[in-house]
A protein has these predicted regions:
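Bacterial N-terminal signal peptides that target proteins for export
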Residues: 1-9
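Extracellular, repeat-based ectodomains that mediate carbohydrate processing or recognition
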Residues: 20-405
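Hydrophobic h-region of N-terminal signal peptides that target proteins for export
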Residues: 12-20
Length: 405
């Protein structure tokens, strides 16, 4: 027993020694995030970095954005505001920027009835120097769930994917907590004028409330998401948009995670030229782990699964992934140790070599912490998350030099 405790203590010290110090991370100033701020979302076009977030005051929701200029947040701007929004820790507004046509896309979820599981995806479009409130991203009128949106620049507009509940019976879910029909994965394209076109069904049965993630690799849109089988296997699948159609979804890796309910823990994808990386969380056989795979051919095939070794800490997921060079990525995830949470990141190259585990911060494991964001901008890695462990819940943002990873 004593020997086991000594080993555990040694490994914990080893982890701590490999974690970076607070000096590696510098807080980002400029725009002050209000006490009620939460749900940050980062997007970088390479030349520009923007953030979106929400605030709530007196039953009114506000969706804001700001730019990263000269090492600080600047030009805070209101995208839209309103009441009866659906905003939660896992399904929150996003933002994207197409530098080819100088347009931006954002969204929020608007309640469509008094039913708990009834809301639409309302999107907002920025062009010619101002934001326009548009209509729904989807083309149905059902009073059901629509959410978990991801978007990415495509040609001179955007590609967007989301979870769509039009084929579910949510009156039944209101009564007994279970929907009678499957959740769909659907997509659409948005033109440089802000118009929606080409709605597609990507997968007719997917996990109900895990994030989708989309990228474009050499002009090919690629979406990853948590799939769902009839026997409740919920592994990660991928589909590519080729010649006007989405390919038949295939599994990224056969984790064979059987779980009778959504784990609310979606995958993440990023691309750099023909290289693609996908990271995800799984707890098959009761063993929680964060893994990733690389592709060298625009997501057509993937190499071996790479485990993000964590030795002591218990990974809980909420992953994000970002290319920082031609063949290197950074992965972030949440872990817990003896009930206390931390946000970690690690550099991995395409050959599977891993750098040190970097501890970003102690972080609450509550749902209100949300899904931390990382984004490369110039020579730095930008980090954003909701600090819900203090008396005042608000967004924190940091930067660290990529050379220190």
């Amino acid at each position: 027993m004593l020997y086991s405790l000594k080993i555990k203590l040694f490994l914990f010290i080893l982890i701590l020694s490999s974690c970076s110090s607070k000096n590696d991370f510098r807080s980002i100033g400029g725009v002050e995030f209000a006490e009620s701020s939460s749900e940050p979302f980062l997007y970088s076009s390479g030349d520009d970095l923007i953030i979106s977030w929400t605030e709530n005051k007196y039953d009114t929701n506000y969706l804001y954005t700001a730019e990263y200029l000269k090492d600080s947040w600047d030009n805070k701007e209101l995208i839209t505001d309103g009441q009866d929004w659906f905003v939660n820790w896992a399904d929150f507004p996003s933002i994207s920027y197409n530098k080819v046509s100088n347009v931006k896309l954002s969204h929020h979820l608007q309640k469509s009835s008094k039913s708990t599981f009834s809301y639409d995806i309302n999107y907002h479009f920025f062009k010619e120097g101002r934001w326009f409130d548009k209509n729904k991203l989807h083309n149905d009128e059902t009073k059901t769930e629509h959410g978990f949106v991801s978007s990415f620049p495509y040609k001179d507009g955007f590609v967007a994917t989301w979870l769509d509940g039009r084929n579910t019976n949510y009156d039944k879910k209101e009564m007994d907590g279970h929907a009678s029909g499957p959740m769909n994965l659907r997509s659409a394209f948005i033109s440089s004028k802000g118009d929606v076109y080409e709605n597609h069904l990507v997968d007719e049965m997917v996990c109900d409330c895990c994030q989708t993630s989309v990228t474009v690799s050499n002009g090919i849109p690629i979406v990853v998401y948590r799939d769902r089988s009839r026997d409740e296997k919920r592994d990660i699948s991928i589909s590519r948009y080729i010649e006007g159609n989405w390919t038949k979804p295939v599994s990224i890796h056969d984790d064979n995670w059987i779980i009778n309910g959504c784990p609310v823990n979606g995958p993440n994808i990023d691309s750099n030229g023909d290289k693609v990386v996908v990271s995800w969380f799984s707890a098959s056989n009761g063993v929680p782990k964060v893994s990733l795979k690389f592709s060298r051919d625009n997501g057509m095939t993937f190499g071996n699964k790479i485990m993000i070794d964590d030795i002591i800490n218990l990974p809980t997921g909420r992953v994000d992934t970002e290319f920082i060079s031609d063949d290197e990525v950074v992965v972030s995830w949440l872990s817990s140790f003896e009930g206390k949470g931390s946000l970690f990141l690690r550099k991995i190259n395409i050959n599977g070599n891993q750098g040190e585990i970097k501890k970003i911060d102690d972080i609450s494991m509550e749902r209100s912490t949300g899904f931390p964001q990382i984004e490369k901008f110039q020579d730095d890695l930008i980090i954003a998350y909701t600090d819900s462990g203090s008396e005042e819940k608000r967004i924190k943002t940091f930067k660290m030099s990529i050379s220190s990873l």
